Amino acid sequence: QIISSVALASFLFCLPVGAQEAAKQWSLEECIRYAIENNIDLKQKELEQKSREVDLHTSKYSWLPSVNASVGENFGFGRSESKDGLIVDRNSANTTAGIQLSMPIFDGLKIPNDIAARKLDLKASIETLNKAKEDLSINVASYYLQVLYNKEMLKIAQLQVDLSSEQVTKTEALYNAGKIPVSQLYDMKAQLAKDEVTLTESQNNVKLALLDLAQSLELERAGENFDVLEPENGDAIERYMSSIIPPDQVYDHAVTFKPQIKEQQYLLESQKKAIRIAQAGYYPKLNLSAGYSTGYYHNFGDGDYNNAPFSDQLKNNGQKSIGLSLSIPIFNRFQVRNSVRTARLSITNRELMMENSKKSLYKEIQQAYYNATAAQEKYISSDKSVDASKVAFSYAEERYGAGKSTVFEYSEAKTKYAQSLAEQTQAKYNFIFRTKILDFYNGTPITL
């Protein structure tokens, strides 16, 4: 009788009605994928990654020459010396134009080391983004399982309403036959009303859980058209029971690929390049420079002036130059030495951060392992509790139907059965979540 009621409640709950017919059911994988594509924090980290790409391009282009053009115009007024050595009154204009090139030939290997450092910084930013994606995936999975948990609690609440409604009908028949007092009938109706309140609360909990999940996905205006796909668990729990991996084994694997570890590795290597960049200040620097300039001179005002044509002056006044400049550091107020010392201190700090990241990862894996084993034990215990309370409720139901027990005894047995089902449901989804977290540390994507 109980089994048939459970089946009926589950069937009725799963029927699509009203707005649910148009609701799209999202799988966990779809939710995670959508969240990764639309999460604002991830988009900001993607921009940070693009910024590191720009830094790398800037560093690579440091080898290219710097080319600049210049144009000038000067005016002279009043007395000045002529080409014959005489002081005369005249006004003049002088136009100049030129182009200059400067290119580093050797800079103490600063540029190649800076390029290498920027490449490592870019890789570190990619791992930062990957870590954020992992955290978001776990967060979405948590909300998703909360929806499944609340939906199963709704089924349990519906079952309680169905059982109470069935007993109200039977109690009314007993009362009409004069076998029980009216007080028992009202007690049973009160129990039904209480179960209906619990059902309403469970329905609201499902809506709130769906809202939390939709908001975690940055899904706007989801409303009634958002729902989740309930996976077929089947023998999943049995598989999860045997999938708990020892923490040391998980850590040995996780430390080789987890993004938070790889990020610190890249940042440490980048800091080592920073020492080479600072040490470049000890070496001479060789630069190539070249240029071309020309000009036009023009006298104007009163007087007999012989101004050469503009094109002839530009051609005849041209001047070319090329040269090498060598800068040799002798004393720089210990700036280079202190820069190197600061870089070495930064390396030591990065090494400590690397070690701390590994220890934090191991602690997280240990915690995930013990949480999974504790959840496993709780689920096994709750499963036994359901079996026992189910038998007790069946016995109480038979006694009440035979008129050998009161409404309170029946309600107490039914309440204990409902509590055991709720505890089993909570233990089940907590166990699933904990095992998924442990598997995730071991490199297995979160799926259901």
Stretches found by the model and what they are:
Residues 20-24, 70-103, 232-242, 276, ...:
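Small/polar, glycine/serine/threonine/aspartate-rich low-complexity segments that form flexible
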Residues 43-47, 60, 91, 105-133, ...:
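Sec/SRP-type N-terminal targeting helices
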Residues 4-14:
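Bacterial N-terminal signal peptides
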Residues 20-143, 286, 290, 334-337, ...:
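Short flexible linkers and secondary-structure junctions
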Residues 19-68, 72, 221, 231-269, ...:
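Bacterial Sec-pathway N-terminal export signals of envelope proteins
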